[in-house]
Amino acid sequence: MKTFDELFAELQERARTRPEGSATVAALDAGVHAQGKKVIEEAGEVWIAAEYESDEALAEEISQLLYRLQVVMLGRGLSLEDVYRYL
């Protein structure tokens, strides 16, 4: 299990080192527009899971949304501090 901050650090490292076959690298290369679409898709899946599925399924969907949001952050060059400033 990892925290939000740990995941972000891991994704930053992947963005920096660009390991071959990395889904995160492919997502970053697809651009912010493509990742924005994925955010919308995952948000819809969170909503459906919240309405009709188990807590476990909901937690998994939320984790996927958080991942996509972090990829958008990296694509735009935002840090966690940039976001935490508004919490």
Curated annotation (Swiss-Prot):
Keywords: Amino-acid biosynthesis, ATP-binding, Cytoplasm, Histidine biosynthesis, Hydrolase, Nucleotide-binding. The keyword tRNA-binding does not apply. Its main location: cytoplasm. Transmembrane segments: none annotated. GO terms for cellular component: cytoplasm. It is found in: Cytoplasm. It catalyses: 1-(5-phospho-beta-D-ribosyl)-ATP + H2O = 1-(5-phospho-beta-D-ribosyl)-5'-AMP + diphosphate + H(+). GO terms for biological process: L-histidine biosynthetic process. The keyword Repressor does not apply. It comes from the Bacteria. SUPFAM superfamilies: all-alpha NTP pyrophosphatases (SSF101386). One of its GO terms (molecular function) is phosphoribosyl-ATP diphosphatase activity. Pathway: Amino-acid biosynthesis; L-histidine biosynthesis; L-histidine from 5-phospho-alpha-D-ribose 1-diphosphate: step 2/9. Its EC number is 3.6.1.31. It is an enzyme of class 3 (hydrolase). HAMAP family: HisE. Belongs to the PRA-PH family. This is Phosphoribosyl-ATP pyrophosphatase.
